Amino acid sequence: MARLGPTPFVNCVTAPEPEAARGGRETQEIRVSKTPPAVWPLSGFGDEIDPDPAVQAAVLLALGASHIEVRSAWGTNVSELEPEQVARLKEILDEKGLKVSAVASPVGKVDVSLPVEHELARLRQIISVARGLETKYIRIFSFYRAEGRSAEDIREDVLVRMGALAALAEESGVVLLHENEKGIYGDTPQRVLDIMESVNSPALRIAWDNANFVQVGVKPYTEGYAMLRPYLEYFQVKDALATTGEVVPSGEGDGELDATIAALKADGYAGFASLEPHLASAHELGGFSGPAAFGTAARAFAALAAKNQIELV
């Protein structure tokens, strides 16, 4: 499998106003963007809309999405879907004209004390689901710890497990996307970077989530973007309030969504933007919004995208 390099950065140049036009006035700086018009494929967590994949697909299509991120179908988590269910899900999505951007697995969303093989077995199951749905991306996490244990206490155990998961992924031709979930080892920019640098695998990249960083007291763009951008391959769209941690529509919280989106565009990002609103409820395996709230979240993000001259398709 070819090594995946970081998306190249694109700079801007500053042009002075022509001498004849200045008339003794101060030089006017004009920012000339060298970034081509951005087009981002739009996706979303279907089960935030409804348990029924047909309803999920209909709503996403109505909101202009071309893809869906699959976490569960008919109320069954992807880690427990039978082959027949995966085949039926693929049929439904094909009929609707939706492709799958990623499988949002629960791998790594367990205590680090469980044996390495526990999550490897679950990842093997998820890989079969990803193949059935024709996507290379699988969302994962970097393990919880028991009360009283520090992040440093579990670091080595986490890195062993993340390395084993990445090795299986690379062997299988898929790419793992680490989400910076609150409470896991990799919930701060510094520890996410530690995972990326320590594992050093082309099959382990970042699913960036602004809201999750806010919930652990981090200013996402200010404190984490430059550090993690070389590994950022997938954008999960969520915002949150710093005071309460409440998830809110894009641009209404403290997640620095506007700055992040502008920077991604300037850097030439062309990957998925996946809506994960969590506007009605959140729980251990995900969250729920319902069709109306999901639409609110989609429109809020679309407004920020339009402001930054990004076309969502």
What positions do the PLM features span?
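Charged/polar low-complexity intrinsically disordered segments
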Residues: E19, E26-E29
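Residue-identity detector for glycine
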Residues: G5, G23-G24
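Extreme N-terminal basic, low-complexity initiation segments
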Residues: A2-V10
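Active-site acidic/histidine proton-transfer and metal-coordination neighborhood
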Residues: N11, K34, D52-A58, E91-E95, ...
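Conserved beta-strand positions in the central sheet of alpha/beta enzyme cores
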Residues: E69, A102-A104, R139, L177, ...
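Glycine-rich, proline-tolerant flexible connector loops at the mouths of alpha/beta enzymes
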Residues: V70-L93, F143-R149
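Histidine-acidic metal/acid-base catalytic patches
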Residues: N11, Q28-S66, D94, E134, ...
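Active-site-proximal loop/turn and secondary-structure-junction residues that shape catalytic pockets
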Residues: E48-D50, S72-W74, P106-K109, S142-A146, ...
